[in-house]
């Protein structure tokens, strides 16, 4: 079956739940894919063309001058002056690092983030990265922050470091199956070009909903 048929089939065979389920691709790399080699370890983001169908929580870390506009846009805002206090509370720092999918930083605050939160965000691959537009100008306007927030909502993180199996969300059951299928297709095309060995490095790919059985698509 093609991808649209696979998306439809998974939904039809899944029991109705009391929440909106997420479609997920489960990718299994081949057993000889050597994660001990640095070049084989991948941490990257992919922008889903049609988004993921539900919002992720994004935290902004800024100085005083961006507090008000950032507070109107982001799900949570941390002021630079509060970073030492947060870093001194290990439980709070871990909770914040876990609670937000993406962290955005005002450019001038980046050195402080590395100093105070680096050991909490780094291992989770959540340090703000300019490559993905996670660092905003010091004089950013509210509309710039809103544009950043909306674009980052489409990102999914790929982390291949310790395990040969990983999952990636590609949409929800409320989305048009054609859009979910296109998200899946575009992601896989990107992945084939992103990892060493390309498609030959992949053993199998499965599609599932949060609480459904999976079906093999590759």
Q: What does each model-found stretch correspond to?
A:
Residues 6, 70, 122, 207:
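Residue-level signature of catalytic and energy-coupling elements of molecular machines
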Residues 13-68, 89-92:
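Translation machinery proteins
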Residues 19-23, 158-160, 194-206:
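Flexible, glycine/charged-enriched surface loops at secondary-structure junctions
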Residues 24, 56-59, 76, 101-104, ...:
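Structural motif
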Residues 62, 170-172, 209-211:
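Flexible glycine-/small-residue-rich
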Residues 80-181, 185:
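Long, charge-patterned amphipathic alpha-helical coiled-coil/hairpin "stalk" segments used as oligomerization
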Residues 182-196:
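A conserved acidic, glycine/proline-rich C-terminal tail/linker
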Residues 206-218:
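C-terminal edge-of-domain segments
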């Amino acid at each position: 079956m093609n991808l649209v048929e696979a998306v439809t089939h998974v939904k039809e065979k899944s029991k109705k739940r009391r929440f909106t389920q997420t479609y997920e691709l489960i990718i299994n790399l081949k057993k000889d894919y050597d994660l001990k080699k640095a070049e084989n370890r991948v941490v990257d983001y992919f922008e889903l063309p049609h988004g993921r169908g539900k919002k992720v929580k994004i935290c902004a870390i800024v100085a005083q001058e961006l507090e008000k506009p950032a507070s109107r846009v982001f799900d949570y805002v941390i002021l630079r002056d509060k970073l030492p206090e947060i870093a001194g509370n290990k439980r709070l720092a871990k909770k914040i690092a876990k609670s937000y999918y993406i962290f955005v930083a005002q450019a001038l605050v980046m050195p402080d983030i590395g100093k105070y939160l680096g050991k909490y965000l780094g291992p989770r691959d959540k340090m703000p990265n300019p490559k993905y537009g996670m660092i905003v100008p010091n004089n950013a306007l509210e509309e710039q922050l809103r544009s950043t927030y909306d674009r980052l909502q489409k990102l999914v993180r790929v982390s291949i470091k310790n395990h040969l199996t990983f999952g990636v969300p590609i949409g929800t059951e409320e989305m048009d199956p054609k859009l979910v299928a296109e998200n899946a297709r575009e992601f896989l095309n990107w992945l084939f070009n992103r990892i060493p060995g390309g498609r030959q490095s992949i053993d199998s790919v499965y599609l599932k909903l949060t609480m459904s059985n999976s079906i093999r698509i590759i």
